[in-house]
């Protein structure tokens, strides 16, 4: 689960992480009030959407204008910048060409920036540990730094038994070239960041840039936080921060029904049980010249109703021109899948090619249900056969 920058900063601040003062605004009047309270003389007006690259982004109605993060020097300019952002669609590298509508603004006090650094904590699969990633190249995408200047990145893996210690934090501070009281400030910053990460079951916290001010303060000028969805049941206060308007409506609906769904840009819908099999299914669709329209894992204990819901989710995408159902019945029974597919196809008046590959528990019964349904369903014997058939059927129907 993702949250907005202002929400991330509010959470981190509770753990002693230093952030600039600021306030969220939904209207021009609220933006003016926040700016007056902060006092100036410099303010930063930031669009709040679930995507990075806001500063370099452009608004659809003003592609040659300024981006979604603006530094201003008067309260009137705060209001004018807010007016130029609210209700407008911001396009960044991460939003895709469709962009995201800006529905709230974060007005923040300006900072006397002397250095920009990068700092994050994440779960490192290679070490199975929480790992600090830091770099002197702040303000840039860390992937770009890793590609062009990998020597400028330092990583520190944290032993889960020991936890983050002061010497870990000082090692990072020294690697970033911090001196004097900056080292102590960075140490406090990191210890608070780690406590927030572990207490709130985060999967990522990224501060880019982490800045050193003229007075030696170490501040989070931006903050991005992701949470482990599987741990949200322990954090109802975090769930309340969810902004469903920033998420795909179909993905939100899928979550409500216990489905794992991610919308993609292709035209062949996929319904599979198991994340690994789902990824393999998408790969083989591409191998045969098609493009998957989604990732959809119905799980191992799906009911007929859940399968029907999954089918409707796929068909809710207007770009879907064909569907491939690929089920290996271990825990899942093939006859349950078949019942769900038939029920959904009848309910939505199926109008696109459908290929079903079943294998495993009750496979013969499942195939019988499909064959006797009277629906134009193509049966496949294996995964390659299924992918080849759906790609061919979609091309012929075009």
From Swiss-Prot:
Cofactor note: Binds 1 Mg(2+) ion per subunit.
Keyword Metal-binding (UniProt): yes
Lineage: Bacteria, Pseudomonadati, Pseudomonadota, Alphaproteobacteria, Rhodospirillales
Record text on subunit structure and interactions: Heterotetramer of two alpha and two beta subunits.
Entry similarity comment: Belongs to the succinate/malate CoA ligase beta subunit family.
Gene Ontology MF annotations: ATP binding; magnesium ion binding; succinate-CoA ligase (ADP-forming) activity; succinate-CoA ligase (GDP-forming) activity
Gene3D superfamilies the UniProt entry points to: ATP-grasp fold, A domain (3.30.1490.20), ATP-grasp fold, B domain (3.30.470.20), Succinyl-CoA synthetase domains (3.40.50.261)
Sequence ranges assigned to domain ATP-grasp in this UniProt record: 9-253
Superkingdom as given in the UniProt entry: Bacteria
Catalytic activity of the protein: succinate + ATP + CoA = succinyl-CoA + ADP + phosphate; GTP + succinate + CoA = succinyl-CoA + GDP + phosphate
Name this polypeptide is given: Succinate--CoA ligase [ADP-forming] subunit beta
Binding positions (substrate): 273, 330-332
